[in-house]
Protein backbone atom coordinates (compact mmCIF):
# COMPACT_ATOMS: atom_id res chain seq x y z
CA UNK A 1 0.00 0.00 0.00
CA UNK A 2 2.36 2.66 -1.23
CA UNK A 3 -0.32 5.34 -1.06
CA UNK A 4 -0.65 5.45 2.75
CA UNK A 5 0.86 8.54 4.40
CA UNK A 6 -1.27 8.94 7.52
CA UNK A 7 -2.38 6.22 9.95
CA UNK A 8 -5.11 7.04 12.47
CA UNK A 9 -5.48 4.83 15.54
CA UNK A 10 -8.30 4.26 17.96
CA UNK A 11 -7.13 3.97 21.59
CA UNK A 12 -9.27 1.76 23.85
CA UNK A 13 -9.39 -1.81 22.60
CA UNK A 14 -6.87 -1.05 19.85
CA UNK A 15 -3.68 0.17 21.53
CA UNK A 16 -4.74 -0.10 25.16
CA UNK A 17 -6.78 -2.54 27.21
CA UNK A 18 -8.40 0.08 29.42
CA UNK A 19 -11.45 -1.91 30.53
CA UNK A 20 -10.08 -2.88 33.98
CA UNK A 21 -9.91 0.80 35.01
CA UNK A 22 -13.12 1.77 33.20
CA UNK A 23 -14.93 -1.08 34.95
CA UNK A 24 -13.81 0.05 38.40
CA UNK A 25 -15.04 3.60 37.71
CA UNK A 26 -18.31 2.50 36.09
CA UNK A 27 -19.09 0.17 38.99
CA UNK A 28 -18.35 2.86 41.58
CA UNK A 29 -20.48 5.41 39.71
CA UNK A 30 -23.44 3.05 39.30
CA UNK A 31 -23.42 2.07 42.98
CA UNK A 32 -22.96 5.70 44.07
CA UNK A 33 -26.32 6.61 42.49
CA UNK A 34 -28.04 3.54 43.97
CA UNK A 35 -27.88 1.22 40.98
CA UNK A 36 -26.60 -2.39 40.87
CA UNK A 37 -22.90 -3.25 40.60
CA UNK A 38 -21.34 -3.62 37.14
CA UNK A 39 -18.74 -6.29 36.33
CA UNK A 40 -15.64 -6.02 34.17
CA UNK A 41 -17.17 -8.53 31.75
CA UNK A 42 -20.23 -6.30 31.32
CA UNK A 43 -18.10 -3.21 30.74
CA UNK A 44 -16.17 -5.04 28.01
CA UNK A 45 -19.46 -5.18 26.12
CA UNK A 46 -20.51 -1.62 26.95
CA UNK A 47 -17.44 0.34 25.81
CA UNK A 48 -16.81 1.77 22.35
CA UNK A 49 -19.32 4.60 22.02
CA UNK A 50 -17.95 7.16 24.48
CA UNK A 51 -18.34 7.69 28.22
CA UNK A 52 -21.95 8.93 28.17
CA UNK A 53 -23.13 5.74 26.46
CA UNK A 54 -20.93 3.53 28.67
CA UNK A 55 -22.48 4.93 31.84
CA UNK A 56 -26.03 4.79 30.47
CA UNK A 57 -25.49 1.13 29.56
CA UNK A 58 -24.02 0.42 33.00
CA UNK A 59 -27.10 1.93 34.68
CA UNK A 60 -29.33 -0.03 32.30
CA UNK A 61 -27.37 -3.27 32.85
CA UNK A 62 -27.71 -3.71 29.09
CA UNK A 63 -26.33 -2.68 25.70
CA UNK A 64 -29.79 -1.20 25.12
CA UNK A 65 -30.17 1.97 27.15
CA UNK A 66 -33.23 2.15 29.40
CA UNK A 67 -35.34 5.06 28.05
CA UNK A 68 -36.64 5.74 31.57
CA UNK A 69 -33.23 6.90 32.80
CA UNK A 70 -33.52 10.64 33.39
CA UNK A 71 -31.01 13.04 31.79
CA UNK A 72 -30.23 14.31 35.30
CA UNK A 73 -29.36 10.85 36.59
CA UNK A 74 -27.22 10.09 33.54
CA UNK A 75 -25.37 13.41 33.95
CA UNK A 76 -24.80 12.79 37.67
CA UNK A 77 -23.49 9.27 37.05
CA UNK A 78 -21.25 10.51 34.24
CA UNK A 79 -19.77 13.20 36.50
CA UNK A 80 -19.07 10.61 39.19
CA UNK A 81 -17.61 8.23 36.63
CA UNK A 82 -15.14 10.90 35.50
CA UNK A 83 -14.07 11.51 39.10
CA UNK A 84 -13.64 7.82 39.86
CA UNK A 85 -11.84 7.15 36.58
CA UNK A 86 -9.36 9.92 37.32
CA UNK A 87 -8.78 8.44 40.78
CA UNK A 88 -7.88 5.01 39.34
CA UNK A 89 -4.71 6.52 37.87
CA UNK A 90 -5.20 4.14 34.93
CA UNK A 91 -2.99 1.68 36.84
CA UNK A 92 -4.77 -1.46 35.62
CA UNK A 93 -4.70 -0.53 31.92
CA UNK A 94 -1.97 -1.93 29.69
CA UNK A 95 -0.82 -1.80 26.07
CA UNK A 96 -1.64 -4.78 23.88
CA UNK A 97 1.26 -6.90 22.54
CA UNK A 98 3.44 -5.31 19.82
CA UNK A 99 1.84 -1.87 20.13
CA UNK A 100 4.91 0.13 21.13
CA UNK A 101 7.28 -1.55 18.64
CA UNK A 102 4.76 -1.12 15.82
CA UNK A 103 4.25 2.58 16.57
CA UNK A 104 8.01 3.07 16.78
CA UNK A 105 8.66 1.44 13.40
CA UNK A 106 5.87 3.37 11.70
CA UNK A 107 7.08 6.62 13.25
CA UNK A 108 10.67 5.96 12.17
CA UNK A 109 9.48 5.08 8.66
CA UNK A 110 8.01 8.58 8.34
CA UNK A 111 4.28 7.93 8.58
CA UNK A 112 2.09 10.62 10.14
CA UNK A 113 0.42 8.98 13.15
CA UNK A 114 -2.79 10.34 14.68
CA UNK A 115 -4.97 9.22 17.56
CA UNK A 116 -8.75 9.38 17.07
CA UNK A 117 -10.65 8.15 20.12
CA UNK A 118 -14.17 8.54 21.50
CA UNK A 119 -12.62 8.78 24.99
CA UNK A 120 -13.06 12.20 26.67
CA UNK A 121 -10.09 14.41 25.71
CA UNK A 122 -9.07 15.28 29.26
CA UNK A 123 -8.04 11.70 30.02
CA UNK A 124 -6.06 11.02 26.84
CA UNK A 125 -2.72 12.88 27.34
CA UNK A 126 -2.03 11.28 30.74
CA UNK A 127 -2.81 7.80 29.43
CA UNK A 128 -0.51 8.24 26.43
CA UNK A 129 2.31 9.63 28.58
CA UNK A 130 1.91 6.91 31.19
CA UNK A 131 2.40 4.22 28.56
CA UNK A 132 5.25 5.99 26.77
CA UNK A 133 3.54 6.49 23.40
CA UNK A 134 2.51 10.18 23.42
CA UNK A 135 5.47 11.32 21.31
CA UNK A 136 4.49 9.12 18.37
CA UNK A 137 1.34 11.12 17.55
CA UNK A 138 1.21 14.37 15.61
CA UNK A 139 -2.50 14.78 16.36
CA UNK A 140 -4.62 13.61 19.29
CA UNK A 141 -8.39 13.87 18.88
CA UNK A 142 -10.75 12.98 21.73
CA UNK A 143 -14.45 12.20 21.73
CA UNK A 144 -15.34 15.80 22.56
CA UNK A 145 -12.81 17.55 20.30
CA UNK A 146 -15.45 17.90 17.57
CA UNK A 147 -19.26 18.00 17.77
CA UNK A 148 -19.55 14.47 16.35
CA UNK A 149 -17.76 11.26 17.39
CA UNK A 150 -16.94 8.18 15.30
CA UNK A 151 -18.64 6.69 13.25
CA UNK A 152 -19.03 10.25 11.99
CA UNK A 153 -16.00 11.01 9.78
CA UNK A 154 -15.57 14.57 11.08
CA UNK A 155 -12.23 13.90 12.84
CA UNK A 156 -10.82 11.92 9.91
CA UNK A 157 -11.90 14.58 7.43
CA UNK A 158 -10.21 17.22 9.59
CA UNK A 159 -6.97 15.22 9.53
CA UNK A 160 -7.10 14.90 5.75
CA UNK A 161 -7.64 18.63 5.39
CA UNK A 162 -4.93 19.55 7.90
CA UNK A 163 -2.31 17.35 6.26
CA UNK A 164 -3.48 18.07 2.70
CA UNK A 165 -4.04 14.40 1.88
CA UNK A 166 -6.62 12.48 -0.12
CA UNK A 167 -8.75 9.77 1.50
CA UNK A 168 -6.81 6.92 -0.13
CA UNK A 169 -3.66 8.15 1.65
CA UNK A 170 -5.12 7.44 5.11
CA UNK A 171 -5.64 4.18 7.02
CA UNK A 172 -7.85 3.93 10.12
CA UNK A 173 -6.88 1.26 12.65
CA UNK A 174 -9.49 0.16 15.18
CA UNK A 175 -11.29 -2.61 16.98
CA UNK A 176 -14.93 -1.60 16.68
CA UNK A 177 -17.60 -1.11 14.07
CA UNK A 178 -17.49 2.64 14.77
CA UNK A 179 -13.85 2.79 13.66
CA UNK A 180 -14.53 0.91 10.43
CA UNK A 181 -17.66 2.94 9.66
CA UNK A 182 -15.79 6.20 10.30
CA UNK A 183 -13.17 5.08 7.77
CA UNK A 184 -15.81 4.11 5.22
CA UNK A 185 -17.63 7.42 5.77
CA UNK A 186 -14.38 9.31 5.15
CA UNK A 187 -13.56 7.15 2.12
CA UNK A 188 -10.29 5.87 3.57
CA UNK A 189 -8.89 2.38 4.17
CA UNK A 190 -9.57 0.48 7.39
CA UNK A 191 -7.69 -2.11 9.45
CA UNK A 192 -9.75 -4.06 11.99
CA UNK A 193 -8.30 -5.77 15.06
CA UNK A 194 -10.11 -8.81 16.41
CA UNK A 195 -9.06 -8.55 20.07
CA UNK A 196 -10.77 -5.35 21.17
CA UNK A 197 -14.24 -4.22 22.16
CA UNK A 198 -16.99 -4.65 19.57
CA UNK A 199 -19.98 -5.71 21.68
CA UNK A 200 -19.23 -9.38 21.06
CA UNK A 201 -19.55 -9.00 17.30
CA UNK A 202 -16.67 -10.13 15.02
CA UNK A 203 -14.93 -7.08 13.54
CA UNK A 204 -14.94 -8.84 10.15
CA UNK A 205 -18.71 -8.26 10.03
CA UNK A 206 -18.00 -4.54 9.56
CA UNK A 207 -15.99 -5.43 6.44
CA UNK A 208 -12.70 -3.59 7.04
CA UNK A 209 -10.13 -3.71 4.23
CA UNK A 210 -7.77 -5.69 6.49
CA UNK A 211 -8.41 -7.87 9.56
CA UNK A 212 -5.79 -9.15 12.02
CA UNK A 213 -5.39 -10.41 15.57
CA UNK A 214 -1.97 -8.70 15.82
CA UNK A 215 -1.31 -4.99 15.37
CA UNK A 216 2.19 -5.89 14.16
CA UNK A 217 0.61 -7.10 10.90
CA UNK A 218 0.09 -3.43 10.12
CA UNK A 219 3.79 -3.17 9.30
CA UNK A 220 3.41 -5.74 6.54
CA UNK A 221 0.38 -3.92 5.13
CA UNK A 222 1.96 -0.47 4.86
CA UNK A 223 5.70 -1.21 4.62
CA UNK A 224 5.97 -4.26 2.34
CA UNK A 225 5.52 -2.24 -0.83
CA UNK A 226 6.61 1.12 0.55
Swiss-Prot record:
Enzyme class label: hydrolase
Record keywords: Carbohydrate metabolism, Hydrolase, Magnesium, Metal-binding
Any one Gene Ontology cellular component term annotated for this protein: cytosol
Name this polypeptide is given: Phosphoglycolate phosphatase
Ribonucleoprotein among keywords: no
Keyword Hydrolase: yes
Similarity annotation: Belongs to the HAD-like hydrolase superfamily. CbbY/CbbZ/Gph/YieH family.
Cofactor: Mg(2+)
Superkingdom of origin: Bacteria
Gene3D superfamilies: HAD superfamily/HAD-like, Putative phosphatase, domain 2
Residues given in the record as Mg(2+) binding sites: 10, 12, 175
Function in brief: Specifically catalyzes the dephosphorylation of 2-phosphoglycolate. Is involved in the dissimilation of the intracellular 2-phosphoglycolate formed during the DNA repair of 3'-phosphoglycolate ends, a major class of DNA lesions induced by oxidative stress.
InterPro entries noted in UniProt: HAD-like_hydrolase_sf, HAD-like_sf, HAD-SF_hydro_IA, HAD-SF_hydro_IIIA, HAD_2, HAD_sf, PGP-like_dom2, PGPase_prok
Source species: Vibrio cholerae serotype O1 (strain ATCC 39315 / El Tor Inaba N16961)
Reactions listed under catalytic activity: 2-phosphoglycolate + H2O = glycolate + phosphate
One annotated GO molecular function: metal ion binding
CDD domains referenced in this protein's UniProt entry, alphabetically: HAD_PGPase
Residues that span the membrane, as ranges: none
EC number: 3.1.3.18
Active site: 10
Pathway entry: Organic acid metabolism; glycolate biosynthesis; glycolate from 2-phosphoglycolate: step 1/1
GO biological process: carbohydrate metabolic process; DNA repair; glycolate biosynthetic process
Gene giving rise to this polypeptide: gph
Amino acid sequence: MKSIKLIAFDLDGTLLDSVPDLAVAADQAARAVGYPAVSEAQVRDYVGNGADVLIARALSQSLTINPELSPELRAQARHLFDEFYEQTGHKLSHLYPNVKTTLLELHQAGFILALVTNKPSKFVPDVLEQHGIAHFFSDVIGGDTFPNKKPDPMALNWLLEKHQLSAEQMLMVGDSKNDILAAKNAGCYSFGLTYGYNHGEPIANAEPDFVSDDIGTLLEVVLVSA
